[in-house]
Curated annotation (Swiss-Prot):
EC number(s) recorded for this UniProt protein: 3.4.11.1, 3.4.11.10
Annotated keywords: Aminopeptidase, Cytoplasm, Hydrolase, Manganese, Metal-binding, Protease
Primary residence: cytoplasm
Organism: Alkalilimnicola ehrlichii (strain ATCC BAA-1101 / DSM 17681 / MLHE-1)
Alphabetical list of InterPro entries matching this protein: Leucine_aapep/pepB, Macro_dom-like, Peptidase_M17_C, Peptidase_M17_leu_NH2_pept, Peptidase_M17_N
This protein's name: Probable cytosol aminopeptidase
Family statement drawn from the similarity comment of this UniProt entry: Belongs to the peptidase M17 family.
Function statement: Presumably involved in the processing and regular turnover of intracellular proteins. Catalyzes the removal of unsubstituted N-terminal amino acids from various peptides.
GO MF annotations in UniProt: manganese ion binding; metalloaminopeptidase activity
Amino acid sequence: MDHTVKSKTADTVSSPCAVVGVFERRRLSPAAKAVDEASGGAITAALKRGDIEAKPGQTRLLTDLDNVKAARVLLVGLGVERDLDERTYRKAVTAAAQAAQDCGAGEATFYLPEVEVKTRDLAWRVQQLAIGVTGALYRFDDMKSEAETPRKPLKKLALGVADKAEAKVADEALAQGMAVGRGMSLARDLGNLPGNVCTPSYLADQAKALGKRFDKLKVQSLDRKDMKKLGMGALLAVAQGSQEEPRLIAMEWNGGKKDEQPYVLVGKGITFDTGGISLKPGAAMDEMKFDMCGAASVFGTLQAVAEMNLPINVVGVVPASDNMPDGKATRPGDIIQTLSGQTVEVLNTDAEGRLVLCDALTWSERFKPKEIVDIATLTGACIIALGHHRSAVLGNHPPLVKALQDAGETSGDKCWELPLDPEYDEQLKSNFADMANIGGRPAGTITAASFLARFTKRYQWAHLDIAGTAWLTGEQKGATGRPVPLLTRYLMDRAGA
């Protein structure tokens, strides 16, 4: 989607559709007031008639208003003015985007960021507009023979700024928000693809394609032979039941100084998870194509970082594999040696994510990271603990955990810290190996992170469990693109952007 900034008032802007906010109790935003005065009170009249009550997310389309250059004016309800908060603002943006597309304008000029949102500045409001519009209009029709396209899709987003002094800030924020939105779309695309298309090799090809787009992005991909030579026994143990070749993918964004330590993101890339010999129930197993959403978020974040040209060094690492039952598959009770040299008794082959991650986390030490964050759809226990609204965050470095929490609050892609006390680590004891790969039913999210913590003692590390936030079920079934907003905001903060 193209985007631009227009330094025009809502009544003078030449646009197929101008989008303005209205509040309950017939209060108008500055843009709505300008249109109302120019048109002889058309908006006030609509409010008096009850055409729109201005409750959050309500919309009403007005056309051919006198003395207004825009062909259409879309009114968007913002609720009570003094109560306008982040959640209400995002709801209004989503509704506005959908209504702007449905009206067939093809292009819309949004004035919503001019309104005051509690504790948030103009840049935040513009970024959230761009992210919200991109997300609201996202469609995944790639696998359909006949795509259900709108009669006239919204192809251009314009941001209306009445105050020219704010145009520069708005322009930069709009570009940043669009980059995050496109990163989320990439993550959603990868997540929504079926397992017979989005294989480990497919992900490696997508990484190479990203590398060709951006000069500062270096890409490498290790195959089974490379992993065997290195001694990645855990990743290979997961992969050995599948005919699909595993891959370990690294994408290095060199936007900072050559000697600056990079921030490393490690994303779980199980492209389809049957559970292996510890086979999952058949119901809803199709959703296990989403088990690579951690990897997808790394792709989306790296693309956003590259589009924004952030002055920071970032490495994205993706251990990619299927987890399949086969005559060669790992059995419950097998003992494997990880890249770190530690041994693991595999009591449950459906706890495979931590196995591919532990080798990737050890391998990532070669980058001499400043901080490492791993992202994984790791445990169903996380859904029980936090539902589908917040991801879980755990780690060995409180300032890093706090930075991720802050990034989540700012972006709206929120996370919640769970403890990582040493007592939980005792649940991983094995009589036959250094550790077991499961710790029983109690505190499943925490014991999974405790397992990973054994491989991250040499650097500052945090773990994001996105099992409850990476995809939706039901009528809106599909990947969400989370936690791309959180990760991108975290890296922007680290880069001072």
